[in-house]
Every structure is written in structure tokens, then in C-alpha cells.
């Protein structure tokens, strides 16, 4: 037997008021939805009262309908804004929970550091570029003709034995005249780029050739079998030793400061005539200001110009070479060549602030 529904205006009004009060006090969406189910769901007093209107006398139905419409509207006006409020609060809480606290300490990944040697070589290149010279890298595996013969080293010249050259087994190359028969070597000096550059670029020529060279030295505090040089070559009309000295002085100032200066001492190199040892003076030398040997230089030997098909009666030139490792040792506190080749990042980090 179906339950008889009775319309009780006071009871339904009280229950709706109770539901509205609970809506106002709800603290989360789950609680709010439960209140809606209790006070506006299928089994709620409001729903039952609405159904009971049909059993009322005709003269009471109109007033009962108005009352139920008002109660539903009151309940909805309380529920809607509260639902929006609690949804916004839930979204803010979720965003706050996902926020990264930037003040928390993090595990930083260690940073590397540039090795001081390539940085020094860039500084040297920048110096020559600032004067309008070109940079020529040359070849590390080179024809013996370019490394020795074209530079006025005779077949039995003592320098060939003294430098203990690495020869590349089973390979031969063409010399400048196109004749096959020149052995391939791992270059012992960046001077090997001189005649090749003259042949390919022509004159006038102003180049700097920084790069690696290779000799059979044992690695110790002052030697390494792989090291770096920078060779500079200028060939033009009317060049003299005065031009050479001017460039050397400017390079010394660029590398060692405004008080640095150079001097030349007579020497001998097959590819220059006259030749000179290049000495450097600068105030920050270890042990106090003084002179140190820095490199070699001289006027290009006429035989070298002839190797490139250039008339030495028309053109003259000068050349000089300095060791990059030696330059770095002179202008820093490095005392052992091992530090330059062992790849310890702690060593490179010492030079970061100077970049």
C-alpha cells in the first residue's frame, strides 16, 4: 500500500531553512552535495511536499504551490553561490599544492670551465684580426715537402733529426710542382703553412697560423709531444726588420700588458735570413721583471719565397713563431705542463674569472 503524502507547510519550511543554514556552513563540495541530496533530493521533505500538493483541496493548491516555489528559489539562491565559492577555494588549494617553492635548496649540477689554452689562442687570433690579417689553420698531416723542403731544410739537414718527426707510413703526396714522392708527416711546426698559403693565396699576404704541432718529446714538466704554436707570416713589397719588430712589440703589449717589450738576438733558422731569437720583458714575470726567451723570428729566406714562385727581388717578408703553452705559462701561475694536458676541471675553473 503506497505511503499517503501529507502537505505540512510548517515542517517543509523549517526543513528548508535548516538546509539553507547548513549550506552556509558547508566547508567543501562533498559536504555541500550531501546537503543538497538530503534537503532537495528525491526523499527530501521538499520533494515529498511538492508531490503532496496534488492531494490538497482546490482552494489550497495555489497557496501551497506559491510556497513551494518560494522555498525552492530560496534553497537555490543559497546553494548556487556557495557552490561557486567552494569550487574556487578547491581550485586555489589545488594550485597551491602544485606550486614549486623556489626557496628550497636544489642539487645544482656542476658546471664545466673552458680550458685556458683555447681561450689564449682566441686572444691571439683576435689580435691579428684587429690588424687586418687572415687566420690560416693549415694541415696537421702535411707533405714533407711543405714541412721541410720548401722551408729550406736540406735532405740531410740536422734539424730533421733533431725534431724527431712522426712520419705517416705508406703515404706519399705531391709537392708544389706536382711531383709525387714527398712523404707525409705529422707537422712539426706551423711554419709548414707558409708556402702552402703563398701558393694558394698569393701576395701580398698577411696570415697567422695557430694550431697543434707534434714531436716525439716525452711528457714532463716543460715538454709535451703535442703542443700549440702560432706562426705569423707577412710578405709584401718593402717589408723590413723594423716592421717585424713593430708587430712583435704590439703582440707583447696585447698579451702581457702595456709595459711589455721585446728584443731580438741573432740566431739561425733555415727559413729566415737574418734570423733572431725573440726575448720578452714584462713586469709580472715570476721572480720579478726581466727578460725571457719567447720565440723565434726573422726575414723570410729568399729560397722560401722561390719555393712559392715569388721573386725575392720584388717581395720581402718576415715571419715569427711563439709557443702557446709557453705564452700561457709565462702569463699565469702554471708551473707544470701536466696541468695543461690532464683535463682536470678544477684546473680550468681557476681561469673562469679571467675570461
Swiss-Prot record:
BP terms from Gene Ontology: phenylalanyl-tRNA aminoacylation
Keywords: Aminoacyl-tRNA synthetase, ATP-binding, Cytoplasm, Ligase, Magnesium, Metal-binding, Nucleotide-binding, Protein biosynthesis
Keyword Lyase: no
Database matches in SUPFAM superfamilies: Class II aaRS and biotin synthetases (SSF55681), tRNA-binding arm (SSF46589)
Any one Gene Ontology cellular component term annotated for this protein: cytoplasm
Enzyme class of the recorded protein, top EC level: ligase
Assigned protein family: Belongs to the class-II aminoacyl-tRNA synthetase family. Phe-tRNA synthetase alpha subunit type 1 subfamily.
Protein name, UniProt field: Phenylalanine--tRNA ligase alpha subunit
Source species of the chain: Bifidobacterium longum subsp. infantis (strain ATCC 15697 / DSM 20088 / JCM 1222 / NCTC 11817 / S12)
